[in-house]
Amino acid sequence: MLIITRKKDESLMIGDNIEITVLKLEDGSVKLGINAPRKTTILRKELYEAVKEENKKAMNIDMNLLKGLKK
């Protein structure tokens, strides 16, 4: 893991086209601004994990349910 220290209004770059800027530091939290191409999906990690888990659940298909569709 790379650890970088930034102050308010300082940025870091990921590749050539993603910029992350520290906008606000308050009460133990950090507000970040992210400039990235529109096609780039940006999710908080807890939301990303929830989506990943739901996708796994969706892949578990009950074959008995599919048999009813053949009729």
UniProtKB/Swiss-Prot annotation:
Family stated for the protein in its record: Belongs to the CsrA/RsmA family.
Stated role: A translational regulator that binds mRNA to regulate translation initiation and/or mRNA stability. Usually binds in the 5'-UTR at or near the Shine-Dalgarno sequence preventing ribosome-binding, thus repressing translation. Its main target seems to be the major flagellin gene, while its function is anatagonized by FliW.
Protein name: Translational regulator CsrA
Location (main, coarse): cytoplasm
Record gene name: csrA
UniProt cross-references to NCBIfam families, sorted A to Z: csrA, PRK01712.1
One of the record's GO molecular function terms: mRNA 5'-UTR binding
Superkingdom of this protein's organism: Bacteria
Keywords: Bacterial flagellum biogenesis, Cytoplasm, Repressor, RNA-binding, Translation regulation
Assembly and binders: Homodimer; the beta-strands of each monomer intercalate to form a hydrophobic core, while the alpha-helices form wings that extend away from the core.
GO BP terms, alphabetized: bacterial-type flagellum organization; mRNA catabolic process; negative regulation of translational initiation; regulation of bacterial-type flagellum assembly; regulation of carbohydrate metabolic process
Recorded GO CC terms: cytosol
Cellular location(s): Cytoplasm
InterPro entries: CsrA, CsrA_sf
